[in-house]
C-alpha cells in the first residue's frame, strides 16, 4: 500500500523559486528529494523527542508508524512544493527554505495544539551521503524558529475535500473475483470462512458485509476513513464477516458515478495506511 511508494525525485536543475510578497525569492535547492531518508540524516533520538512533544498516541514498536508517517508526509510535501513554488507564497508551501535551512510542517500538534516542525540544516560531515541533517522537532513558539519569516503549512492530500466523505448515493462495485480469489487477500480472511466447502458461504458473507458497511457509513459518515494511495484518495469501510466486530477493511475508490472496491486490508494495515494522512478517530480502526 502507500508505504511502497518512495521514488526519488530531484528538483530540476533550473531550480524552483517561491515568489515572496515583497518581490524577493527563496531558492529551493537541487539537493531536495522526495525520500526523507535520502534527503537528510535523521538521528534516532529525534523521534523520541517528537513522541514526547506531540499529543500522545501509539506509534508502534520502535516508532515504526511515526517514521512511515513522516516519510510519507515529507514525500507529499516535496511534491506540493515543487508543483506550487512558482504560484504561491512560502507560507502556503509545506517546505520553507530560509538562510540555508529547511523547515517542514510535520502535520502533528502538541497537547495544546501548536504546530510541530522538523528543522533541517546542511550536513557538514565529510563524505556524508545525505546533504541535510535533521536538527530536531520544534513547536511553533520555540525560539529556534524565530529566524523564519514564514512557517510552512500542513501537507494536504485531497484536492477536493468532498473526496474525504462517503457519498451514500453512489453504489459500490466489488471485484469479487480478485478480493476472494487473490492469494494475498485470502490470507486476511477469517479461517472459519476458508476452504472449498465454504466458498459459497464466504461470497455471501462478503456481499452482505459490503451492504451493511455501506448502510452504516450512510448513517455515520465518519465511519469511512480516508487513505492516500496511487495519488488518489480512497476510503476504508469496516467489514463484519462473522461477528459484529470488524475483521477487514474494504478499500473503495470513487469513479464516475460509483465506488470501485478492489481489495481488503487487515485492520492493522488499514490503520497504518490511514495514519499516513491523519490520526483516525473512529472506534473501529483506532489502536
Residue ranges, per PLM feature:
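An acidic, glycine-rich, mixed-charge low-complexity segment common to nucleic-acid enzymes
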Residues: 1-230
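Compact beta-sheet-dominated globular domain cores
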Residues: 232-287
